[in-house]
Amino acid sequence: MTTNYAHYIDHTLLAMDATEAQIIKLCEEAKQHHFYAVCVNSGYVPVAAQQLAGSSVKVCSVIGFPLGAGLTAAKAFEAQAAINAGAQEIDMVINVGWLKSGKIADVKADIKAVRDNCAATPLKVILETCLLSDEQIVQVCKMCRELDVAFVKTSTGFSTGGAKEEHVKLMRATVGPVMGVKASGAVRDRATAETMIQAGATRIGTSSGVAIVSGQQAAASGY
């Protein structure tokens, strides 16, 4: 059976120097190729929502991005503001420093605060797996399952590494068959996308969506 790669793709542009014209182009590409969503910084949600109005492509906003180290109240507020501006999905970054400090209750409360402000809007929780041990990945995945979030997500694409097959497999094994798993960071071609899907990913975050659906090799840089 042929994989419908477009349905997996969150077409992504999160660079700090991304221009409005580039966001508009991102949205046009997403409509043309029928991607699942575009993923942008919260400040560009109104532009993306306007460009995608009337289409099937959803608007996803990152929150607390890329460090995840801000105040919990700020993350919760940003999530609600992004939803009010037109975001239909939210991707938040956990506080990795708190996790590594053993502040597990604070990490869970941080996720819960954003989840509570998302209401019915799907929440994806970014683990930044390149910075975590397998035990920590399992710990956060179990936490997210308990909090009934929609997805766990591998990476911001702004740290020391992106999605790895073994991490996606571990995340899938931990959360079970129903919860979403998003592989993001360094997924730049169809072969890598297929590897992630076979490992258990149900969404792919990438700036190389056009290359993936066309079967081409994308640039070595990019999300």
Swiss-Prot record:
GO (cellular component) term, any one: cytoplasm
Protein EC: 4.1.2.4
Listed GO MF terms: deoxyribose-phosphate aldolase activity
GO process terms (BP): 2-deoxyribose 1-phosphate catabolic process; carbohydrate catabolic process; deoxyribonucleotide catabolic process
Chief location bin: cytoplasm
SUPFAM superfamilies linked: Aldolase
Pathway linked to the protein: Carbohydrate degradation; 2-deoxy-D-ribose 1-phosphate degradation; D-glyceraldehyde 3-phosphate and acetaldehyde from 2-deoxy-alpha-D-ribose 1-phosphate: step 2/2
Function statement: Catalyzes a reversible aldol reaction between acetaldehyde and D-glyceraldehyde 3-phosphate to generate 2-deoxy-D-ribose 5-phosphate.
Family membership: Belongs to the DeoC/FbaB aldolase family. DeoC type 1 subfamily.
Designated name of the protein: Deoxyribose-phosphate aldolase
